């Protein structure tokens, strides 16, 4: 017998501060709870379930949360265009799981399937238990500078701090990911043959 409950929630908000500055905040929640109940009657093969039957009960819960905030700038200065986004995000995941199996401990009364009927002993009962918490924190920035809609300079930078890096040399500084790219649209500067509808050169 299986049962699942799931909750999904998503929120977002945008605020246009000026004609060139926008603030944005987003958040997501995904929570799931699973329950598994397995019953093996005493008439089943003894090697599989023992003399009085076998009962397995598992509870699994996972909660994932994500949120980010960004400031976005979009502005034109004469022949130049500027498109910038700066922000931060957090990704959080919590997992809890417990699995109880009567196989090694046995049932006190045959074919009575509940936790109270399991003969709890050091050899059986809880054969799996998970309590895990993972978190990723990030800051990031992207910028594109354009000139006469024909040349573009793209810059990105991101720094991540992961809970898996705790007690390592990367715990405080995390990991930094920069990138630089340049794009050139020849058709904005040179008359192209009619059979060329679009051209682009890019280096990174």
What annotation goes with each model-predicted range?
Residues 1, 38-53, 96-126:
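Surface-exposed loop/turn segments flanking beta-strands in extracellular/periplasmic regions
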Residues 4-77, 81, 134-167, 171-188:
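Surface-exposed extracellular loop regions of Gram-negative outer-membrane beta-barrel proteins
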Residues 7, 117-138:
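Outer-membrane beta-barrel signature, preferentially recognizing the C-terminal barrel domain
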Residues 30, 88-96, 160-161:
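Short, internal active-site loops enriched in acidic
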Residues 89-93, 185, 204:
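Short glycine-rich beta-strand segments
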Residues 189-204:
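Outer-membrane beta-barrel translocator/channel fold
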């Amino acid at each position: 017998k299986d049962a699942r409950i799931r909750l999904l929630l998503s929120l977002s908000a945008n605020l246009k501060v000026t004609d060139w500055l926008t603030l944005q905040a987003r958040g997501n929640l995904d929570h799931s709870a699973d329950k598994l109940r397995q019953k093996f009657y005493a008439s089943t093969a003894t090697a599989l379930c023992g003399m009085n039957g076998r009962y397995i009960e598992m509870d699994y819960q996972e909660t994932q949360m994500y949120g980010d905030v960004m400031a976005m700038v979009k502005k034109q200065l004469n022949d130049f265009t500027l498109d910038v986004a700066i922000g931060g995000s957090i990704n959080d995941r919590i997992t809890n799981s417990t699995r109880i199996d009567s196989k090694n401990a046995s049932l006190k009364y045959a074919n009575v399937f509940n936790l109270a009927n399991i003969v709890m002993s050091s050899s059986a009962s809880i054969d799996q238990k998970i309590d895990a918490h993972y978190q990723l924190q990030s800051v990031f920035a992207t910028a594109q500078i354009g000139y006469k809609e024909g040349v573009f300079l793209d810059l990105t930078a991101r720094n991540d701090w992961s809970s898996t890096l705790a007690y390592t040399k990367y715990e405080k500084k995390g990991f930094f990911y920069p990138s630089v790219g340049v794009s050139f649209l020849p058709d904005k500067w040179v008359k192209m043959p009619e059979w060329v509808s679009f051209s682009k050169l890019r280096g990174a």
